[in-house]
Amino acid sequence: MKQLNRLPNAGRTNPDQNINFTFNGKAYQGVMGDTLASALLANGVNVVGRSFKYSRPRGIVGHGAEEPNGIIQLGSGAATVPNLKVTQVELYEGLEASSVNGWPNVNFDLMGIMGWFGRLMPPGFYYKTFMYPQKLWMTYEHFIRKAAGLGKTPVEADPDVYDKLNQHCDVLVVGAGPAGLVAAREAAEAGARVIIADEQSEFGGSLLASAQTLSSVSASQWVADMVEQLNRYSNVQQLPRSTVFGYYDHNFLTILEKRTDHLGLSAGKGQQVRQR
C-alpha cells in the first residue's frame, strides 16, 4: 500500500516494519513507531471526525492530548475502548478503529444538513425546544445523543487485567522533556528517591522533533545520554506511557500507566496487566 504523504527518512519510525490496520472499515498500512494519527496522515486521510452540533468535517490539528477532532472508537466487542484520541494511540498490527460520529460515514454525514439551520439553533436551544411534551423527552434524547458524537461503552465484561501499586518518592517529575530530565538527574544525584513520568512512549518531549544541538550533540543524542544516565541510578524509577492526572491532599498523586495498550492483540487478552 502506498503512503503518499510519508516523508522519507523523517520522524522516529521504522519504515522497514509495516503494520496493517483498519480505519472506518478500510484497510491501511503504517510503520513501526507511528501513532494512528501519523499513519492516517501518511495515507492521505484528512477527515477523521465531525464537529458537534453542525457535523462539519474535521481533521487532525494537534499531536497529543490537546487534539480536539480525532476522537475514535478502538477495537470491538468486550475490549472496545471509546473516545480515544488518534494522536495518543500507538499503531499495532491488526488495530481496528472508527470515528465516533458521522452517518452513514465520516466523509458523507447526513447530519451535516444541520449547518443549514444554524441561525435557528443558538447555543442551548435544545434545553428549551425539546422540553414539551415531557413524555417525548426520551425520544428526543435518543437522537440528541447520536448527534453528540460520543463513543459507545462495551456491555460485556472487561476481559483485560488491571493492577494498582502504591509507590513512595521524594521527588516526582511530571514530564520527561529537557527540563524534566535535568531535574530528575539532579534530584537523583542528591540522593532523592525519584519517579519521572511522561505520557509519551519515549522520553524527550519537544526534543524528539528538534534539529537543534545541546552540549555539542544532537537533541536526540542528548536525550539518549540523559536516559542512560538515569538508568544508572537505582533510586530513579522511569515511567513512560504514564499520565499524572490527580494531585490530592498530603502530596498524594495518581498516575495511569499504559503497560500493554501499544501491543494490541499480541499482548493476549487477560494474560498481562493492561494498565495500572
Predicted regions and their residues:
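Signature of N-terminal electron-transfer/Fe-S-associated modules in redox systems
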Residues: 1-150, 158
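FAD-binding core/adjacent interface of flavoenzyme oxidoreductases
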Residues: 55-61, 96-174, 220-276
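Beta1-alpha1 glycine-rich phosphate/pyrophosphate-binding loop at the start
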Residues: 169-232, 243
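Short, hinge-like loop/turn segments at secondary-structure boundaries
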Residues: 67, 212-216, 257
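Conserved beta-strand segments of alpha/beta enzyme cores
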Residues: 46, 193, 235-237
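Fold-independent oxyanion-binding glycine-rich loops
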Residues: 24, 43, 75-76, 134, ...
